[in-house]
Amino acid sequence: MINTRKTHPLMKIVNNAFIDLPAPSNISSWWNFGSLLGICLILQILTGLFLAMHYTADTATAFSSVTHICRDVNYGWIIRYMHANGASMFFICLFMHVGRGLYYGSYTFLETWNIGVILLFATMATAFMGYVLPWGQMSFWGATVITNLLSAIPYIGTNLVEWIWGGFSVDKATLTRFFAFHFILPFIIAALAMVHLLFLHETGSNNPTGISSDADKIPFHPYYTIKDILGALLLILALMLLVLFSPDLLGDPDNYTPANPLNTPPHIKPEWYFLFAYAILRSIPNKLGGVLALVLSILILILMPLLHTSKQRSMMFRPISQCLFWILVADLLTLTWIGGQPVEHPYIIIGQLASIMYFLLILVLMPAASTIENSLLKW
């Protein structure tokens, strides 16, 4: 009997990716975040599509249209809050997914890793532009501050910023183009995610030990499909708890005030998931230096395969590296806290120390620890 699942041109692609895919028998729950990111993306595209049906990308009506969605559209409030808090869940999953890759040495799959970094940048760009759309105070001033950073680029900076703005300030043209980009980018992200998966399936998944699992593979279905469904249920539970009980917990109250170019909010800050990078940007008292540090704080991920000096792939059997990894996590949490604080003593110095520590850990301490661990293994 011929199995259609294995012969049909389209179904066999799905079959080879999600059903008969040989997977390591020992991958832990840290491997759930890839599928959770896929679910987040689908959820964001669907809720975003329904929001776009009622939203108007015009400075005069954008704020009112969001209010209209929440008050007058059937279940508009839940769609809006699922979209806003869905972004937070998306970034939680992203950080966990990247952290897993760093801990278990998954970055040695070069193509998969590099596309992953591009995906991270694309998602950050999408989230930033989405935050501008409600046209509240923080939307407007956030857009002004972040786009203005490009003026630090020598020679072409000012022209570049005005070109992005479509004028001499953040205005109607900026809002319209941000909406256009915010709408198209998730589909580009979806396409890149498929390429990400394509490259992953060329090599097969990594596993917690970092050792080849070719000798012990199990089919993806039913083992990991059921595991992914459990993860998805927990994700949706967490999202709905946030949406239904405290939808504005992660938002900024300033964004409930319509955008006013004549009135600057006392503390301009981005959404919580950008605060670590924002803290690094602010910790350098030079505009160009700050912008470079901001970009490098994410771009440094590209260097991870080059900085891998250990003879072992995973950190599972490397206690010194494990210790440094968790210090790095604590450092990022510190930066996130600092990013949300005003620029005053003692926050300035804490931010500067945490920023130095961030680059020092990744560029110096972790590769050095790996080298030390290599020599410790020679009995």
Curated annotation (Swiss-Prot):
MF-aspect GO terms: metal ion binding; ubiquinol-cytochrome-c reductase activity
Protein source organism: Gazella subgutturosa (Goitred gazelle)
Pfam families linked to this entry: Cytochrom_B_C (PF00032), Cytochrome_B (PF00033)
Domain of life from the UniProt record: Eukaryota
Cofactor(s) it depends on: heme b
GO terms for cellular component: mitochondrial inner membrane; respiratory chain complex III
Functional note: Component of the ubiquinol-cytochrome c reductase complex (complex III or cytochrome b-c1 complex) that is part of the mitochondrial respiratory chain. The b-c1 complex mediates electron transfer from ubiquinol to cytochrome c. Contributes to the generation of a proton gradient across the mitochondrial membrane that is then used for ATP synthesis.
PANTHER family in alphabetical order: CYTOCHROME B
Binding site for a ubiquinone: 201
Annotated protein name in UniProt: Cytochrome b
Signal peptide, first to last residue: none
SUPFAM superfamilies noted in UniProt: a domain/subunit of cytochrome bc1 complex (Ubiquinol-cytochrome c reductase), Transmembrane di-heme cytochromes
Keywords: Electron transport, Heme, Iron, Membrane, Metal-binding, Mitochondrion, Mitochondrion inner membrane, Respiratory chain, Transmembrane, Transmembrane helix, Transport, Ubiquinone
GO biological process: mitochondrial electron transport, ubiquinol to cytochrome c
